[in-house]
Amino acid sequence: MYHYTESGLSNVYLKNGVTVEVVDGEEYTSIDDMNGLHSAIAQTIVNTNKPLAHDEFKFLRIELNVSQKMLANRFGVDEQTIARYEKGQTKIPRTTDAALRALYMESQEKNNPVSYFLDLLANTQAEEAAKIIRLEEVEDHWEKVER
């Protein structure tokens, strides 16, 4: 499996959909359907019933194509608060977590009420070890691989 660290996440592995070529002694990696892959990663993160990790928060913000400043304005906090969430210096409040998930789903036109995400997080404990996200390319799209 290819460890896809280029996403900014340490727990993403790709079963296929990756081509590695060596040209003039340099190794080049290409990934099929990058937009679809990032969408599959984001969907997996959004639908996971554990609080967002700092790197997942940043990944979703980048997928939304919004700056820290713009997201801070939406959430009514200062830009440094968003930066601290993304650096893991400050715990991400449950309501902020749910709101970011809802914003992402809205951007994909897959609207879920914020209460869905609050309920998803309500009775969970943050896991010590990061959950590994395994994806495979199936025909023309990426899917989560169940163990």
Model region roles, listed by residue range:
Residues 105:
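Mixed-charge (Asp/Glu-Lys/Arg
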Residues 76-92:
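Recognition helix of helix-turn-helix/homeodomain-like DNA-binding domains
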Residues 62-80:
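Short, compact, well-ordered microdomains
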Residues 1-51, 109-147:
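N-terminal flexible/basic segments that precede or flank functional cores
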Residues 89-101:
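Short, basic-rich loop-to-helix N-cap that marks the start of a DNA-contacting helix
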Residues 57, 71-72, 82-85:
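Conserved hydrophobic/aromatic packing and binding residues within compact polymer-binding modules
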Residues 50-66:
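Short, amphipathic alpha-helical "recognition" segments used to contact nucleic acids or chromatin
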